[in-house]
Structure formats: structure tokens, C-alpha cells
């Protein structure tokens, strides 16, 4: 009886979680040295998102790969952030992020450009729901640092309405200035 209830709860949890897309970024075999020798385990880095502007990453360690992935997925769902997207497909402005020796540059891109980004950053953008972006990784190519640097950059992403409110100007004035600058560059 208890088993049936647990299965029903798990099925309900899976249906709720089906809104999220998860990507395995990196899996690593780790060793714990003990008196009798080495104990091997696995560490997983997962990125989870709803493809509508919410994304999170998690790290999990366990003796078996599936358990490490499950732990990482749970951690990613706990620590999700919201990123405002322009037209639901790209970033509002160019931004830079850092973590440790990792540095990333993210640039908004015109429609049809696609996701031009390397490994770990691509997984973040695909789960976030970004369709057009150009990203460059500088410094460390460690997947953990790259993901954290990408999240640092995304946390600094602001909607133009928030920028206008901070500056004490109207949103329409900010948009007009943007179109003047963009128009003069072309």
C-alpha cells in the first residue's frame, strides 16, 4: 500500500518537473582516499531551465552516476534565477561575467543568428530559452567556472524598464536613444 502511494507521488512529481529541461554539462570521476585505498565516486554538473527565462545549475556527488545526476538536478531546481529576455529570444544588452579565472562575454544577436557559444555556455542558453546570442569565453575553460561566470553575467542582465527607472527617465526616451545609437551604427 505504501509503495503504491510513493509511486503515485513520484509520478506527480515527474509531471510537475516536466516543464523543465535539463542538460548534463560535465561528469567527472572523483576519488576519496581512505586508509584501505581509494573510494571512487562521480560528480555531475547539470543545468536546468524552463526555456522561458528561468535557469539554474547544480553540482552533485555520489558513488553512482544516476544518483549524482539526481542530486545535481535537485540542487539546480532549488537555485534558479530569472533572466529577462528581449522578444523571448535574446538578451537585452551585452554583458560580462567572471568567476575565478573564467570570464565570459555575452552579446545580444539579431534574429536567426543562433546560439554561438562553446560547450557549457551553450547548455545554459538552450535551457534558458535563448535562441540568438553570441558568447565568448576568455580565461579558464573549466566547465564549473564557465557556468558560474555565465550565471554571473546573466544576473547582471536588466530589463530596459528597470534601467530607465534607475536613471530616472522614461522608458520611451531610453528606447528612442537606443534606436538612435543602433541606427547610426548601421
UniProtKB/Swiss-Prot annotation:
Task: Name the domain of life.
Answer: Bacteria
Instruction: Choose one Gene Ontology CC annotation of this protein and give it.
Output: small ribosomal subunit
- GO terms under biological process: translation
Query: Keyword annotations for this protein?
Result: Ribonucleoprotein, Ribosomal protein, RNA-binding, rRNA-binding
Q: Does the keyword Ribonucleoprotein apply?
A: yes
- Give any GO molecular function from the UniProt entry: rRNA binding
Q: Which InterPro entries match?
A: Ribosomal_Su5_D2-typ_SF, Ribosomal_uS5, Ribosomal_uS5_bac-type, Ribosomal_uS5_C, Ribosomal_uS5_N, Ribosomal_uS5_N_CS, Ribsml_uS5_D2-typ_fold_subgr
Where the record annotates domain S5 DRBM, the positions are 20-83
Q: Does the keyword RNA-binding apply?
A: yes
Q: Copy the domain comment.
A: The N-terminal domain interacts with the head of the 30S subunit; the C-terminal domain interacts with the body and contacts protein S4. The interaction surface between S4 and S5 is involved in control of translational fidelity.
Q: What does this protein do?
A: With S4 and S12 plays an important role in translational accuracy. Located at the back of the 30S subunit body where it stabilizes the conformation of the head with respect to the body.
The family line of this record is: Belongs to the universal ribosomal protein uS5 family.
The UniProt entry, under HAMAP family, shows: Ribosomal_uS5_B
Give the quaternary structure: Part of the 30S ribosomal subunit. Contacts proteins S4 and S8.
Q: What is this protein called?
A: Small ribosomal subunit protein uS5
Taxonomic source organism:
Brucella ovis (strain ATCC 25840 / 63/290 / NCTC 10512)
Amino acid at each position: 500500500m505504501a509503495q503504491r502511494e510513493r509511486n503515485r507521488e513520484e509520478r506527480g512529481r515527474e509531471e510537475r518537473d516536466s516543464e523543465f529541461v535539463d542538460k548534463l554539462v560535465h561528469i567527472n570521476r572523483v576519488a576519496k582516499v581512505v586508509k584501505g585505498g581509494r573510494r571512487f565516486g562521480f560528480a555531475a554538473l547539470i543545468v536546468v531551465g524552463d526555456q522561458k527565462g528561468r535557469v539554474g545549475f547544480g553540482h552533485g556527488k555520489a558513488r553512482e552516476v544516476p544518483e549524482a545526476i539526481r542530486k545535481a538536478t535537485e540542487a539546480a531546481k532549488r537555485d534558479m534565477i530569472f533572466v529577462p529576455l528581449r522578444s523571448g529570444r535574446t538578451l537585452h544588452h551585452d554583458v560580462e561575467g567572471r568567476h575565478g579565472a573564467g570570464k565570459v562575454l555575452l552579446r545580444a544577436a539579431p534574429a536567426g543568428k543562433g546560439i554561438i557559444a562553446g560547450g557549457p555556455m551553450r547548455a545554459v542558453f538552450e535551457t534558458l530559452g535563448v535562441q540568438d546570442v553570441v558568447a565568448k569565453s576568455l580565461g579558464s575553460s573549466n566547465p564549473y567556472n564557465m557556468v558560474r561566470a555565465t550565471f554571473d553575467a546573466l544576473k547582471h542582465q536588466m530589463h530596459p524598464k528597470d534601467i530607465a527607472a534607475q536613471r530616472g527617465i522614461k522608458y520611451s526616451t531610453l528606447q528612442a536613444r537606443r534606436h538612435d545609437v543602433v541606427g547610426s551604427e548601421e
